[in-house]
């Protein structure tokens, strides 16, 4: 169906990257609640994954994620999404409006991929 696969990954990024390559995944993979370091973030991004950040995050990792690959979440937090987004924006050194634009760009990328894959599957039928 091409829907994004939302993953929780703790200390298994190498295995996750290997699995994505092995199965030749075409749908987007989003690692939610990402708390890893910048090096792990770069590896996951290089493997084509998206990263979602919540209340707890590694500031250096957050700074290496480009627009179009970044999401913000509340998952396990009692904080409101706008509070988390404000902290993320401050950490990235950007205004909240720019962060909002970056996240919207990510959503557009995810939806575009989902619709493109769904369209390809319909044409095969």
PLM feature segments, named:
Residues 48-60:
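His/Asp/Glu-enriched short active-site or ligand-binding loop at hydrolase and phosphoryl-transfer sites
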Residues 68-80:
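Short acidic/histidine-rich active-site segments
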Residues 16-18, 41, 62, 80-86:
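Histidine/acidic-residue-rich catalytic or RNA/ligand-binding cores of hydrolases
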Residues 11-13, 35, 55-57, 76-78:
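Active-site-proximal loop/turn and secondary-structure-junction residues that shape catalytic pockets
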Residues 1, 85-125:
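Mid-to-C-terminal alpha-helical segments outside catalytic/metal-binding sites
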Residues 1-47, 93-97, 116:
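Divalent metal-binding pocket/active-site signature
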Residues 6-7, 30-32, 52-54, 71-74:
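Active-site neighborhood of phospho(di)ester-bond hydrolases with catalytic His/Asp-centered motifs
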Residues 47, 65-66:
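Short, structured coil segments at secondary-structure junctions
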